[in-house]
Amino acid sequence: TNTSSLLGRQFTKDQVVDENTGSFRMYWLDFCEFDNTLLLFGKIRTRSGQLISGMVQVKGFCRELFFLPREGKVAADVHQEIIPLLMEKYGLDNIRSKPETKKYAFELPNIPHETEYLKVLLPYQTSKSKNVTIPAELEGDTFCHVFGGNTNIFESFVVQRKVMGPCWLEIKNGDFDQLKGASHCAVDVLVSKPENVVPIADKMVPDLNCISVSVQTVMNPRE
């Protein structure tokens, strides 16, 4: 690919998305978190086989919280206590949750090796208290500990989507219009749900042109 000919050029959805699958492929190389969403940067493969620069913003992530019931309590008791409080605090109409058995192998005392927790999916993007996290030491009448309250969006992405470092991703249902021109990349895409981003087994690694910038401070001898 002649990369110089692609600089400054914006590619359209029709040039990128496979008409048979409705998806496109991206080799992600870097990321950043912005306004409780995840921005992925990397190389996107066009329908003609070109590799172009791309930015994909992924919304809709949920933080996975695990509430440990007190002795003599069960997940249903925790649900009855905590769900209404979370809905009020974060301005949510509903919250998904379910009992889930988990193992624990770290240093905190009084944590069972294996037991049933209440798993709660708390959206990162909420109408209220969106930057307020749940502290691990939070306790209630029915629970004595909370895991996952400080998990960041990138950690949620790699764990929930099973992404093992830079790799090829198959991305569906991308919006190519809403973010057009938001970055200096050739393609800017918005994806509303992380479930539309799936890692795939493709060992071909795209070429990458890099530039290194060294910044040095120098004292002004005149001042």
Kindly label every feature range from the protein language model.
Residues 1-223:
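The two-metal-ion catalytic cores of nucleic-acid processing enzymes
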